[in-house]
Amino acid sequence: MSTRRVYFFGETPENQPANSELCRKVLGGKGISLAAMIKLGMPVPLGFTITCQTCVEYQKTASWPKGLKEEVASNLKLLEEKMGKTFGDNTNPLLVSVRSGAAVSMPGMMDTILNLGLNDESVKGLAAVTGNARFAYDSYRRFMQMFGDVCLGIDHDKFEHALDAVKTRYGRKTDPELTADELEEVCEAYRKICVAATGKTFPQCPHEQLELAINAVFKSWTNPRAQAYRTLNKLDHNMGTAVNVQSMVFGNTGDDSGTGVGFTRCPKTGEKFSYLYGEFLQNAQGEDVVAGIRTPVNLKEMPTINASWKACYDELSLIYAKLEGYYNDMVDLEFTVENGKLWMLQARAGKRTGFAMVRIAIDMCKEGMLTEEEALLRIDANKINEFLFKRFDPSVKPVVLGKGIPASPGAAVGVICFCPMRTCELAEQGKKVILTRIETSPEDILGMDRAVGILTARGGQTSHAAVVARGMGKCCVAGADCCQINYATKTLVIGDRKFKEGDFISINGTTGEIYNGAVQTIEPGITDDLQTIMDWSDKYRVLKIRTNADTPHDAAVARKFGAEGIGLCRTEHMFFAADRIMAMREMILSDDEGARRTALNKLLPFQREDFIGIFKAMDGKGVNIRLLDPPLHEFLPHTRDLQKKLAEDMNKKHRHIHERVEDLHEVNPMLGFRGVRLGIVYPEISEMQVRAILEAACIVSREGVTVKPEIMIPVLFSENEMEIMHALVNRVAASVFKEHGTTVDYEVGTMIELPRACVMADKIAQTAQYFSFGTNDLTQTTFGISRDDAGKFIPKYIDRGIFKVDPFVTLDQQGVGALMKMAIEGGRSTRTDMKIGICGEQTDPASILFLHKIGLNYVSCSPYRVPVARVAAAIAAIKARTNQ
């Protein structure tokens, strides 16, 4: 049986519901939305969809698979019959759009072509049959520009410059002011551009145009911006895009025509208004709205234009309600009005901010559309981070330079940069950047990702900048027409103020205001809506959530966000403070044990005070403290000048310091003299740390604070190491408890971060009371990859399909995960109730689902990621219980 590659709108694979997962994989997001709207009885221009799998086949051979040409031809013939027009006819031509449509929405990342089928002769026929020459030549020049850019590879700016030249010649400020004759001049200029760039005339055969356009959409699946978007959003590079060939309807035939984009609820806040939310442009085509080249009008103004527009508004109101009821979600829709008749072009679950996501989930639950569990499954856990962004200090009164459209909420402070690639460079240097553009385009995606905020002079709520910024959770102010941006001089002028690249500004994505300089921000808190989601999450999750915290402040912040303990307290971070680094260096540079103990006695009070603060902050929650992990050379200066300064401060010879640094240097420190190896060779270091932990525990215990210290031994690979360190801890504990006249409960466990430790887990568990996985080092040692050097090749590995995602971001379930399962089974075969957690930074939802399934007790993350982990753990529990 041959594989079917083309479906006419309304048809679905195996007659499945249009919103089924099978249909999404075959027809793509746009394809299933068109099929669904037809089945719902909505006005949709007819057409057909070429499947996502066909794109995958095309990528392998760069040619159409056998049978595709015949399927396209038969569906094109059916379209001609239903529309009563002929493709390629010069008197009344059937014109089509060719659009991409992947299974997962990738707004603006791939290519679109409108008005395909026009040529030098059929444009005259279109003018005659419509009686509107201006419309015909406007459609032709749009088609030539899109086709030239997408299919012929001609720089988009060349067409824009030619258009601007004609507008300047005739004194026209906007595109709609151009007459039919003037637009015909634009078309002639475009013909010359095509000949100059390709050596050939602009393609005149509509069937050739269609084949080239379909190929271009297939190829756009692998363009750099699309690949970057998929990598940023962890999307499968192998799913391919569908191609939708759809009969054209025109929003540029006059003032009773137009095009628009709407949302059934506000994509910024989630609010459901009494009026329709969205934007539209009269006498325009669809790309005009999302491109942000013209600033559109609010949809609620539509019924005030005239009776025809009011009728469209009323029909659109019914469609809003029907679509939201069908999707049970906030819907993003696109439409065109042609000579007063409404046509629907697309509907899909809309991109939204984290604030809107939470508000919509809660409201739909209140409205009876969703259960709590269903509402939680609509939450993207990573977008919870947006609630934790800083906001501007209300006590500060900044200088307001101007105002644009508040396109994506938040507060962003950074230096101005006009170039997306330069933004990436500055971000690499640690600078916070406001990407400042006339308007953004899909090519800007990497710069937008690295910027802290986005400012555009053109565009509206539904422009590319706004949609992508909301999807990324970036602060964005769009359509700030007070901004004059000059890329050549790298300047931004607002009123009488002139700014150059590198100057600081601040933007408020909630109000749309632009402020002078760097405005002070304050820390966020838990809102009522977020608290509701947290309460729901805590009701359904099984995994406990701990935090990584090295200071009392970090511990207090994590408790505020709901942390149920500390999963990793890194003691080495405490030694880098200015008031203790010298004592640490004295200890390292000591020539014998006695001198080392003297230096360690100086460090003991510092460590004890740190632990007192942390124990008080956690008040009864478990605190997992890792003994010294990094090699000693990391605490010493590496340059000659700094070594000389240290020698002077310690009253030692420079040569002595330099030789000691050289002695401690390691060829491969990750696998060298670190962790448990330090504790066994220099037991006095571990003894000091254990004493500090347990003395602090005794002190706070006497003050009435419940304390649960957990002492973790890092980087071990054998039960022998565990036995030696367990005995050391018990020996120090006995001494401390005798001195303080009291005891506290404590546990001794280990960090599982080497493959051999996973294999030997049953034996290690004979002494270790708990395990905590260190997934960073376990990933490094399993793959044989240094995390610090992986950036040189992991992106290429992802491009080539060797990795689907970065294994240091999303846990490798097949390799590292298999070792973890082995360790869990081994550990619990010895201790059936063994507590097992993870102390690497793990809030990736896919990783948390896996960790839930293999039976971990807790995960741990940075303080500000605790709410994210709480939600991800709840989603994991719901999915596991419902086999999703």
Curated annotation (Swiss-Prot):
GO terms for molecular function: ATP binding; kinase activity; metal ion binding; pyruvate, phosphate dikinase activity. Mg(2+) binds at E753, D777. Phosphorylation of Thr-462 in the dark inactivates the enzyme. Dephosphorylation upon light stimulation reactivates the enzyme. Gene3D superfamilies: 1.20.80.30, ATP-grasp fold, A domain, ATP-grasp fold, B domain, Phosphoenolpyruvate-binding domains, Phosphohistidine domain, Pyruvate Phosphate Dikinase, domain 2. The active site is at H464 (tele-phosphohistidine intermediate), C839 (proton donor). It comes from the Eukaryota. The keyword Cytoplasm does not apply. It is an enzyme of class 2 (transferase). The keyword Magnesium applies. Residues 352-408 are annotated as: Linker 1. Residues 508-542 are annotated as: Linker 2. Homodimer. Belongs to the PEP-utilizing enzyme family. The reaction takes place in three steps, each mediated by a carrier histidine residue located on the surface of the central domain. The two first partial reactions are catalyzed at an active site located on the N-terminal domain, and the third partial reaction is catalyzed at an active site located on the C-terminal domain. For catalytic turnover, the central domain swivels from the concave surface of the N-terminal domain to that of the C-terminal domain. This is Pyruvate, phosphate dikinase. It comes from Giardia intestinalis (Giardia lamblia).
